[in-house]
Amino acid sequence: MFSNLSNSEILNNLLEGRDLDDLTSRSLMQRWLNDKVSDVETGAFLSALRAKGSTGVELSSMAEELLNVCDLPVARPNLYLVDTCGTGGDGANTFNISTAVAFVAASCGVKIAKHGNKSASGKVGSADVLLNLGLNLNCSLEKVINAVNEIGITFLFAPVWHKSLIKLAPLRKTLGIRTVFNQLGPLVNPLRPNAQVLGVASEDFLKPMGSALLKMGMNRAIVVHGSGGLDEASLQGENKLVFVENGELRFSEINISDFNHENIANEKLVVSDFQSNDEILKSVLNGSGQKSHIDVVALNAALVLWVAGIEDDLNEGFNKALISINQGDPWKKFLLLKNYLSEN
């Protein structure tokens, strides 16, 4: 079923700028999973893929192979699930916007299956902040899945579900560059969500990530690259979007000014340390946060409400998110999840 090309032949193709087809992409991932690629070869593959740029076929094929070895301990909930996991790696050191967005969207009725990890860069990862706020990430996998049914939101800690990739972590850290695995992370949620808002740190990722989501059968999705280089929709200016719907990609832009709100520089969203990040996240969720923090979360939550089919008008979604935040509903949702995952 898989490619007969040797590792060196695949590498030569990449170095010469040739895209990998479906079978070769799947074969390469299988070799990683089965320890058929040396550290030296892995470093070369990752560097060559980064230099060439990954395609939608390469990303979707590799992601499918990762998902094929990720077994669920219980049946997937029969729900329309949405994820807010992005690539990270924008280097902007903003507070963890996508995590706040997940709880805001859940408080508005979206069934959220949030996939995430600890930080692999200077930015605070979703798992870091949730651990600091007391969320139990060591409970049974059955409970993690059942939380979606019981609470309407759950968090899937990536290393627990993708143990086969742990061995690559030291090498990726040594390389110190964004690799194809940064792009694969948002594509390998074990619960295979029906819809997703996926932030990317590079404008070059918009089309391939959108194409990958399309090939993987996503019902609705938005891939977003924020003004100023954020991997979230930004308040600073024009944000570039790719809408995935009805088997097609549609390119668009949005600006916070479209929502009758003023533009605000990304620097207003920066945090200096873990404690600041935790405090900001809590203040946004309970409705006591700064206007810039609340607005950027509401803007991104509007995108989630669109992919979930709850609000087809982004302005309506933005206002719905603001109302929920001002009532403190997202923080109540967080506490429900925290208490549920802490129960024996």
From Swiss-Prot:
Record-listed 5-phospho-alpha-D-ribose 1-diphosphate binding positions: 86, 89-90, 94, 96-99, 114-122, 126
Positions contributing to Mg(2+) 2 binding: D231, E232
Residues where Mg(2+) 1 binds: S98, E232
Enzyme Commission number(s): 2.4.2.18
Pathway as given in its UniProt record: Amino-acid biosynthesis; L-tryptophan biosynthesis; L-tryptophan from chorismate: step 2/5
Pfam families xrefs: Glycos_trans_3N, Glycos_transf_3
GO (cellular component) term, any one: cytosol
One Gene Ontology molecular-function label: magnesium ion binding
Gene3D superfamilies from the UniProt entry: Nucleoside phosphorylase/phosphoribosyltransferase catalytic domain, Transferase, Pyrimidine Nucleoside Phosphorylase, Chain C
Protein keywords: Amino-acid biosynthesis, Aromatic amino acid biosynthesis, Glycosyltransferase, Magnesium, Metal-binding, Transferase, Tryptophan biosynthesis
Keyword Magnesium: yes
Keyword Amino-acid biosynthesis attached: yes
Catalysed reactions listed for this entry: N-(5-phospho-beta-D-ribosyl)anthranilate + diphosphate = 5-phospho-alpha-D-ribose 1-diphosphate + anthranilate
Cofactor binding, note field: Binds 2 magnesium ions per monomer.
One of the GO BP terms on file: L-tryptophan biosynthetic process
UniProt cofactor(s): Mg(2+)
Alphabetical list of InterPro entries matching this protein: Anthranilate_Pribosyl_Tfrase, Glycosyl_Trfase_fam3, Glycosyl_Trfase_fam3_N_dom, Glycosyl_Trfase_fam3_N_dom_sf, Nuc_phospho_transferase
Residues binding anthranilate 1: G86, N117
Binding site for anthranilate 2: R172
Protein family per UniProt: Belongs to the anthranilate phosphoribosyltransferase family.
PANTHER family to which the protein is assigned, alphabetical: ANTHRANILATE PHOSPHORIBOSYLTRANSFERASE
Protein role: Catalyzes the transfer of the phosphoribosyl group of 5-phosphorylribose-1-pyrophosphate (PRPP) to anthranilate to yield N-(5'-phosphoribosyl)-anthranilate (PRA).
Quaternary structure, from the entry: Homodimer.
Protein known as: Anthranilate phosphoribosyltransferase
Species of origin: Prochlorococcus marinus (strain MIT 9215)
Gene responsible for this protein: trpD
